[in-house]
Amino acid sequence: MRRATLIPLAIWVAGAAAAAAASLPQFPSCDISLANIGLSQNSQIFFPNGSGWESETIRWTKYMAPTYAVSVRPAHVSDVTQVRFATRCKIPFLASSGQHGFDTELAELQNGMEIDLSAFRNVSVDAKKNTLTVGGGVRFMDVFDPVFNAGKEIRTSETDHQVGTGSGACVGMISPTLGGGVGRLSGTHGIISDQLLSVQMVTANGSLVTVSKKENSNLFWGLRGAGGNFGIVVEAVYQVTDLTSEKVVNLDYAFSTNDTGAIIDYLALFGPNMPPKLSFIIAALYNEKLFGGVGDPGCVDPNRGRQSANTIPPSLFQFAVIVSGLYAGPQSEAEQLLAPLLQNATLIKQNISVVPENKLVYAATFGSQGNSTIACSGKGVNRSIFGGAINTYDKATYVDFLKAFGDLVTTNTDLRGSVFFIEHFSNYQVQKIPDHTSAYPWRDITAHLLFNYAWNDPANQQLMLYSARKLPRLRALKKEWDPENVFRFHHPISMS
C-alpha cells in the first residue's frame, strides 16, 4: 500500500414496450423483442428514433459516451438474467442507473445494448436487523430520508464506525459502492463499500449469484473496489445502525483567486491529518449564476461586513474559489477550526447553517450539490474529467494555475462551465479498515482533485485505479467470473 500522502486530482473543461421483433443491422442474426430476449411483459425496449429514446439513453456527459442500437429496461431480476441473450449474440452491453459515468473506456461501446436498471429503485430499512436493502437502480437521493427517518445511519460492518453517503444526490448508489465510495463524511463514516454486506449479481452467463463474506467471498473482495468488472448488481444490502447525530454544520465561503495561496496554506496545515469530523470541497469556477451577481445579500464587504447594496467589485463575481466545509460536530468547534483561513483570506460571501444529515447534500456548496445542480441537471453536455494523484500541495503551482484558469474561463464564454475541484476529506476511519480486506487500494489518499479536461493514459490506467499489489488477484477473478470479458467498458481489468 502506498504510504505517501496522495492527492488525486480531476478537471471538467424507443418506442416503449415494443412488441414486434426488430432485426438490427448490427446484429442481423438476433431479432430484438421481449419474447426473443426472454423478457417479461412489463419490461420495455427502446429503439433509436422511437418514443422515449433520447430521455432513455441521454447521459450526464456526451463526451466519449457509449452509443446504443437498443435500450432494454427490465422489470424483474429474472429479466436481467437474460443478459445471456446479449452475450450469445455478441452484443456489447452496459448496465446503467444514474448514467453519470465518465470514464473514457465507455466510448469503446458503440452501437450496443443499454440495460437500464431504473425500475430497480426499491429501498427498505430493517430496523431490527440493522440493514438497508436497495435495488440496482437506486440513487443516493432515494436512501437519505428512509434511513434517516428510521433513526438509522449507514455504518461499516463489524465496527462502530459511521459511513456516509455520497456528495451528489442523483448519482447511482451501486456504482460508487463498487468503486469504493468516498464521501464528505469519510473521516467519521469511512467508505461506503466497507459496510456492504452482500449483493445479488447477474454474471455474464445469466446466473444470479449471492456474493458476501460467506458466499463467493473471493469475489466479494473484488467487488469492493473493482465491482464493475464482474457482473450486474441488481440488489445490495448494507449495514446500518442507530443514528448518533442528527445534524451537521455546513460552512460555505467564497473568495477571489487572490486568496488561492491562503487557501492552499490552510489545507496544507492538515495534510493527511484532517480532523475526522471536518471535510472540504474547494471549487474554482465562473460563478455569476451560482451567486446571482453583485448585490447578492450573502455578499460580504471585508471592511464593512455583510452588504445588500452593490458594494463588491463585479470582477470578484466572475471567477471565484468556493470553500465548502462540513463539520460533524458543534458549530463553535467548526468556526474555531476555520478561523485561521478567515484571518488570512478576504471573504466575498458566506453561508453557515446547521442542517439535518439527510439534507446536507442539498445545502452544501451554496446549495449546488442538490437535484438542480452540476451533478443532477444539464444532461447531454460535453464534460470530461482528468484525474491523477500528487503527494503534496505546491502553493506556487496552485496560485499560478488558478490565475490562468480564471482568466481562461472568464474571457472564453464557451468554457464557463468548467470547474476545478479539490475534495479534501479525512481518511481517519478509512484507514482503520485493513487494506487486505477489499480490492479498494487507496485508503491513504488525502484529497481528491477534479478538473473538466480531456485526458487519458491507457498504459497506466489499471495501475492508477487498482494498484500493482491488487491487480494479480483481480485478474484471476476476472478470468474466473468473466472469461469472455463482456464487462469491459468501465474501468476495465485486462486479464494479462
Swiss-Prot record:
Q: What positions does the domain FAD-binding PCMH-type occupy? A: 64-243
Q: Could you say which residues form the signal peptide?
A: 1-21
Q: Which residues are glycosylated?
A: N49, N122, N205, N258, N344, N351, N371, N382
Which Cys pairs does UniProt list as disulfide-bonded? none
Q: Which superkingdom, per the lineage? A: Eukaryota
- InterPro entries for the chain: BBE, FAD-bd_PCMH, FAD-bd_PCMH-like_sf, FAD-bd_PCMH_sub2, FAD-linked_Oxidoreductase, Oxid_FAD_bind_N
One Pfam family named in its UniProt record: FAD_binding_4
Query: Which is an annotated GO molecular function term of this record?
Result: FAD binding
Give the induction annotation: Expression is up-regulated during co-cultivation of A.fumigatus with Streptomyces rapamycinicus that triggersthe production of the polyketide fumigermin during the bacterial-fungal interaction.
Enzyme Commission code = 1.-.-.-
As cofactor, the record names: FAD
Q: Which UniProt keywords apply?
A: FAD, Flavoprotein, Glycoprotein, Oxidoreductase, Signal
Return the PANTHER family for the record.
Answer: BINDING OXIDOREDUCTASE, PUTATIVE (AFU_ORTHOLOGUE AFUA_1G17690)-RELATED, FAD-BINDING PCMH-TYPE DOMAIN-CONTAINING PROTEIN-RELATED
Role description:
FAD-linked oxidoreductase; part of the gene cluster that mediates the biosynthesis of fumigermin that inhibits germination of spores of the inducing S.rapamycinicus, and thus helps the fungus to defend resources in the shared habitat against a bacterial competitor. The partially reducing polyketide synthase fngA alone is sufficient for the production of fumigermin. FgnA catalyzes the condensation of 3 malonyl-CoA units to an acetyl-CoA starter, and 3 methylations to yield fumigermin.
Tell me which family the UniProt entry assigns to this protein: Belongs to the oxygen-dependent FAD-linked oxidoreductase family.
Q: What is this protein called?
A: FAD-linked oxidoreductase AFUA_1G00980
Name its species. Aspergillus fumigatus (strain ATCC MYA-4609 / CBS 101355 / FGSC A1100 / Af293) (Neosartorya fumigata)
